[in-house]
Curated annotation (Swiss-Prot):
The chain crosses the membrane at residues 412-432, 444-464. The gene is MRS2-A. SUPFAM superfamilies: Magnesium transport protein CorA, transmembrane region. GO terms for molecular function: magnesium ion transmembrane transporter activity. This is Magnesium transporter MRS2-A, chloroplastic. Residues 1-55 form a transit peptide. Its main location: plastid. InterPro entries: CorA_TM1_TM2, MRS2-like. Magnesium transporter that may mediate the influx of magnesium in chloroplast. A motif (Required for magnesium transport activity) lies at residues 432-434. One of its GO terms (cellular component) is chloroplast membrane.
Length: 474
């Protein structure tokens, strides 16, 4: 059985060896040789030589070599299905390999925030690397958040952090980040203060932040809530403002700054709306114009929004005060303390830390109660102004209804008068026809007819008016 092989060299010419029971032997020149043996092999060799156009002189003896001319190089590379790979397929495979290397390199660049990212990628193994390549090939990008990081010493920096790095550094779970994810602001508009083992998630309107033991990450820092929070937090972290007293834990400073900034924003909004509503309440009873009514509508809408936000914040603070477990979890954050699952008591390895945590628990309760009172005051004032605006709307509606009633009465009286006059016009029309009544020959007939029409119309009007008054229609 004969087979064909080729040498994997890149020269312009290659030797093709036909193997007949013996392995091929290279000859001195650039061609190939054929070894044959025996009579059967010799006959077979003669046939091959004749077909290739060689003379018998080039053949050896019984075991001689048959010289073959140089042939073009054949590709020895084979595909997975056993067929030879063409040049185009080899170029496509090389391009695919280069593209795959580029994708894996891009994935490594994204996943490498430092040495931690390299160690994490090495720990995941080859399977995770395959997942990363598929992650990019599908066009799916891991969410990357642009946040401001404020440390406990007051240093502030802007950074980009992926969701995986965020979960790893804060010890949170994926479902925990939904309350602070800026892309889900329509689904998590309710204010919340979630306490976890290593972080506190703050969601107060446009303010979204994650407070940890030594730093805080602020999302949407360009929003009004984020700017107000930074203006309230940074002065607290200045060592000159401590006045030598004991400093509060950093996470408590963050919580208080967040609540303070939110309450102050609500108070400023109330202070802008209250004078405007008061001025409208004084003007409206005597001046019912379209502009004044439109201002009343806008003010009422602003009061409804303010009352809703203050009410949601008040309910969040009430729920937090009703759950002492959450307050204790805030106190033990960053300390070697745990909470007993049965009695919910704090257990600390150092007695001093337990004493400090208990004192902080009382401070947190007083802090929350203080902001709860301010929030209730805002909510109550907004509700009172809203009630006044609604009462004014009811008064305006009654006033307009009374005016419409007066217009309807006048219109009815005019219709009655018109009816009575129409009867007189009917009589005049009858006499105005070209019929001979023989009254036109008498001078007194005109005055008698005119007086009768006027008296009849007036009498008919008073009769209809008394009837409508009796039926309480007028």
């Amino acid at each position: 059985m004969a087979s064909v092989s080729s040498s994997p060299s890149y020269s312009s010419q290659a030797a093709v060896l036909l193997l007949l029971h013996q392995p091929p032997h290279q000859h001195g020149h650039g061609g190939a040789c054929l070894r044959y043996r025996g009579s059967q092999s010799q006959g077979r060799g003669n046939a091959v030589a004749t077909s290739l156009g060689l003379s018998a002189a080039g053949r050896g003896g019984a075991g001689g070599l048959l010289l073959l001319p140089p042939l073009p190089a054949l590709r020895a590379a084979e595909g997975k299905d056993g067929r030879a790979v063409t040049k185009d397929e080899e170029e496509e495979a090389a391009a695919a390999a280069v593209e795959e290397e580029g994708e894996v390199e891009v994935r490594r660049e994204e996943d490498k925030p430092g040495d931690d990212g390299s160690r994490e990628a090495a720990a995941r193994g080859s399977g995770s690397g395959r997942f990363s390549a598929d992650y990019i090939s599908l066009g799916i990008r891991e969410p990357v958040y642009e946040v401001i990081e404020v440390k406990s010493n007051g240093r502030m920096s802007t950074k980009k952090i992926s969701r995986r790095q965020l979960l790893k550094s804060s010890g949170l779970r994926l479902r925990d980040t939904r309350s602070v994810d800026p892309s889900l602001w329509l689904m998590n508009s309710m204010p919340s203060l979630l306490v976890r083992e290593q972080a506190i998630l703050v969601n107060l309107g446009s303010l979204r932040a994650i407070a940890m033991h030594e730093r805080v990450l602020i999302f949407n820092y360009n929003s009004p809530g984020g700017k107000a929070f930074l203006d309230s937090l940074l002065p607290r972290l200045n060592p000159r403002n401590i006045n030598g007293g004991p400093a509060m834990p950093f996470q408590l400073e963050v919580v208080e700054a967040a609540l303070l900034s939110r309450i102050q924003r609500l108070e400023r909004r109330l202070m802008r709306i209250e004078p405007r509503v008061g001025a409208l309440l004084e003007v409206l009873p005597n001046r019912l114009t379209a502009d004044v009514l439109e201002q009343l509508r806008l003010s009422k809408q602003a009061l409804v929004e303010l009352g809703s936000r203050a009410g949601d914040l008040k309910q969040m603070l009430i729920d937090l005060l009703d759950d002492p477990h959450e307050i204790r979890r805030i106190c033990i954050m960053g300390r070697n303390c745990t909470l007993d699952k049965l009695s919910d008591n704090m257990e600390c390895s150092v007695p001093l830390e337990k004493q400090i945590a208990e004192e902080e628990e009382e401070e947190i309760e007083m802090l929350l109660e203080n902001y709860l009172q301010r929030c209730e005051s805002i909510h109550g004032q907004a509700e009172r102004l809203l009630d006044s605006a609604r009462e004014m709307e009811d008064s305006i509606a009654v006033n307009l209804s009374s005016r419409r009633l007066e217009v309807s009465r006048v219109e009815l009286l005019l219709q009655v008068g018109t009816f009575c006059v129409a009867i007189g016009a009917l009589i005049a029309g009858i006499f105005g026809m070209n019929l001979k009544s023989y009254l036109e020959t008498n001078a007194w007939a005109f005055w008698a007819t005119t007086g009768g029409i006027v008296v009849g119309a007036v009498a008919g009007f008073f009769i209809m008016y008394s009837y409508l008054k009796t039926r309480k229609i007028l």
